[in-house]
């Protein structure tokens, strides 16, 4: 009888402990624990960060980083299995889908800046980029001033189109800005001569040019609409427990040899599906950000020492 009572007491303690653990969880971690699912938002054409391969599977530098976060979440929650579901997002839908719980991580090419931090949070920086324009060499466009009075494409809902709009107004350039739904559409407008230039993050412009039918016919401006700005994995605002797991996972990754290997894989080697090699070495500023991980939106935080 005493043995049965002891067994009952042990079971009661275990059940209470399990319930207490569940009750202590909040926000995204609790959602994931209850459902056994983590939802990742991906882009379909943000090479090499987040895009679809020939089998329509999301791949890329940011996707690999997010999968490291998934591993950390699984370990944190002591789950035997954690299902990953991928959801497509665009520049216009990524923040709303994060806010309403459709996705838990946005793994793409999203700039961490003060305006976005009013709505969302970011984990540690994984890339630095500046807003520039791409054009055909035959157009002979060398500076931002050369875009005066011309049709220029940029993607809706991006920092790029905002910076283009502000520059257009402040310099009285009279540019006809053509909004595109996705980055690939912005570049396509230049390819098909519907626009003389496309304004995007310089690394995305490089990837589109490299994947075009005639890469040598395009040129990316040295003139920039911005200082180098940080990319980060986007997550919900005011969710410190989930952000802590993501920050720790990315910090460990970036400071390790695996972080360097991951960068080499996507920027210095041939990547699927077309075997492109972007050949973009890691700059001094990004090396510093990897050695000392930070989620700062301030470009000055990334100046090489």
PLM region spans:
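Ligand-binding clefts/hinges and TM-proximal coupling segments of bilobed small-molecule sensing domains
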Residues: 23, 159-177, 216-218, 250-305
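Immediate post-signal peptide segment of exported/extracytoplasmic ligand-binding proteins
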Residues: 22-55, 140-150, 286-305
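Extended ligand-binding regions for polar small-molecule ligands
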Residues: 23, 29, 64-72, 145-146, ...
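A ligand-binding cleft/hinge motif common to bilobed small-molecule-binding domains
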Residues: 93, 107-118, 163-170, 188-192, ...
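Bilobed "Venus flytrap"/periplasmic-binding protein-like clamshell domains
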Residues: 39, 44-48, 58-75, 111, ...
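Periplasmic-binding protein-like
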Residues: 44, 127-138, 210-250, 269-294, ...
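Extracytoplasmic small-molecule ligand-binding "clamshell" domains
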Residues: 22-106
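Acidic, polar ligand-binding/catalytic clefts
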Residues: 67, 79-146, 287-298, 304
